[in-house]
């Protein structure tokens, strides 16, 4: 039986473990600061989504006007 892919599998497993460790380290620190930064990120995402929806609404209205 060939076992040539053990090294590759070990690398993949280690990369996954390192990603999880990095994610956990990101969650460390002052919870209040993290909560504020997360809230700011969500506000930015929401503002972008609102702007996109508004642009889509304007495009839809323009398309309806040109049909008439």
Swiss-Prot record:
It is found in: Cytoplasm; Nucleus. It holds the Pfam family SERF-like_N. The keyword Metal-binding does not apply. The modification Phosphoserine is found at residue 37. Keywords: Cytoplasm, Nucleus, Phosphoprotein. Residues 1-43, 50-68 have a biased composition (Basic and acidic residues). GO terms for cellular component: cytoplasm; nucleus. Residues 1-68 are annotated as: Disordered. Its main location: cytoplasm. Present with 876 molecules/cell in log phase SD medium. Belongs to the SERF family. This is SERF-like protein YDL085C-A.
